[in-house]
C-alpha cells in the first residue's frame, strides 16, 4: 500500500508525510474479540444535538485501549478511482492486501480512527458537526505529527468534505479539501435525468471485479469463529453489503495480526 502511494506521489519515505495522500482509509470499524466470537462495529456516535462530545469519545477510546478484548480498527485503503460508491473497482485479492487491523500504542491515533469510524456512519451530518470532527482531528494531529496521523487526518478531511458535498451541506472543509471524485460523479448522475442515469452509471460507476471468485487465506480458521458486523447504512458503508467484502472482513478480523503502523516510519 505504501509503495502504491509513493509511486503515485513520486516521493520517498522521508517527505511522504508532508504530501496529500492519493489513498484514503475507508470502512473503518472497531474490532473486539472474545474467545471464538468476533465483532466489528462502528465507533458509537458521540453527538448530542449536533455537538461532538469530545470527553465521551476520549473515555471510550481509552476504555478500548485497556480492554483485553479490543483487537484494533479494521480498515481498507483505496485509491480514489477504486471507490465507486456502489462497487469497488479492484479484484478480491487486491482488496485483501489493502485490508488490515490497525492497533497503535497511541491513544491519539486510536481517537483519529474513532473519528473516521463515526464520520462514515453519520446518517444526518451537519456543517457544525463536520467542522467539529475536522477541528478535533487537526488538534490531535498537532500532538502527534507522525506519518500515520497525517494519513488519518487526510482521510478525515476528505470524508468530511465528501459528506458535505454529497448532502449539500457546504461545510468549510469542502473549500479546503476536494470531495472524492467518484462520489461527486455519483451524486451528479443520481440528480440528473433518469434516462441518462441508466446509461451513465454502468459506464462510470459499476465494476464487477469484486465478484471474482477468491479463496481467502486462513479460511478454515475464520470459519471456526462467530463473526458479527454492525454499522449504520450510509453512502460510505454500501460496500459492507457485498458478500465478498464480508467474507474478507471476517477473515481479516478473525485471523490476522494487528499492525502498529499504517505507513512505515
From Swiss-Prot:
<keyword id="KW-1035">Host cytoplasm</keyword>
<comment type="similarity">
    <text>Belongs to the herpesviridae cytoplasmic envelopment protein 1 family.</text>
</comment>
<dbReference type="Pfam" id="PF01677">
    <property type="entry name" value="Herpes_UL7"/>
</dbReference>
<keyword id="KW-1040">Host Golgi apparatus</keyword>
<keyword id="KW-0946">Virion</keyword>
<dbReference type="InterPro" id="IPR002600">
    <property type="entry name" value="Herpes_UL7"/>
</dbReference>
<dbReference type="GO" id="GO:0019033">
    <property type="term" value="C:viral tegument"/>
</dbReference>
<protein>
    <recommendedName>
        <fullName>Cytoplasmic envelopment protein 1</fullName>
    </recommendedName>
</protein>
<dbReference type="GO" id="GO:0044177">
    <property type="term" value="C:host cell Golgi apparatus"/>
</dbReference>
<keyword id="KW-0920">Virion tegument</keyword>
<comment type="function">
    <text>Plays a critical role in cytoplasmic virus egress. Participates in the final step of tegumentation and envelope acquisition within the host cytoplasm.</text>
</comment>
Amino acid at each position: 500500500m505504501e509503495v502504491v502511494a509513493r509511486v503515485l506521489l513520486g516521493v520517498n519515505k522521508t517527505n511522504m508525510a508532508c504530501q496529500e495522500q492519493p489513498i484514503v482509509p475507508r470502512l473503518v470499524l472497531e474490532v473486539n474479540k472474545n474467545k471464538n466470537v468476533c465483532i466489528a462495529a462502528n465507533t458509537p456516535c458521540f453527538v448530542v444535538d449536533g455537538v461532538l462530545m469530545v470527553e465521551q469519545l476520549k473515555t471510550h477510546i481509552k476504555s478500548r485501549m485497556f480492554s483485553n478484548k479490543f483487537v484494533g480498527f479494521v480498515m481498507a485503503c483505496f485509491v480514489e478511482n477504486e471507490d465507486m460508491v456502489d462497487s469497488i473497482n479492484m479484484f478480491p485479492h487486491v482488496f485483501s492486501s489493502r485490508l488490515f487491523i490497525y492497533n497503535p500504542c497511541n491513544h491519539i491515533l486510536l481517537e483519529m480512527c474513532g473519528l473516521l469510524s463515526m464520520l462514515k456512519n453519520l446518517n444526518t451530518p451537519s456543517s457544525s458537526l463536520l467542522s467539529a470532527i475536522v477541528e478535533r482531528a487537526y488538534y490531535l494531529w498537532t500532538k502527534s505529527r507522525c506519518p500515520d496521523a497525517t494519513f488519518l487526518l487526510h482521510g478525515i478531511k476528505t470524508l468530511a468534505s465528501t459528506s458535505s458535498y454529497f448532502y449539500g451541506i457546504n461545510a468549510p472543509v469542502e473549500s479546503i479539501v476536494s470531495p472524492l471524485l467518484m462520489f461527486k460523479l455519483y451524486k451528479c448522475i443520481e440528480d440528473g435525468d433518469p434516462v441518462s442515469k441508466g446509461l451513465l452509471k454502468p459506464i462510470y460507476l459499476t465494476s464487477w471485479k469484486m465478484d471474482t471468485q477468491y479463496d481467502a487465506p486462513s479460511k478454515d480458521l475464520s470459519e471456526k469463529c462467530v463473526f458479527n458486523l454492525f454499522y449504520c447504512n450510509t453512502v460510505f458503508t454500501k460496500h459492507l453489503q457485498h458478500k465478498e467484502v464480508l467474507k474478507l472482513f471476517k477473515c481479516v478480523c478473525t485471523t490476522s495480526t494487528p499492525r502498529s503502523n499504517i505507513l512505515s516510519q
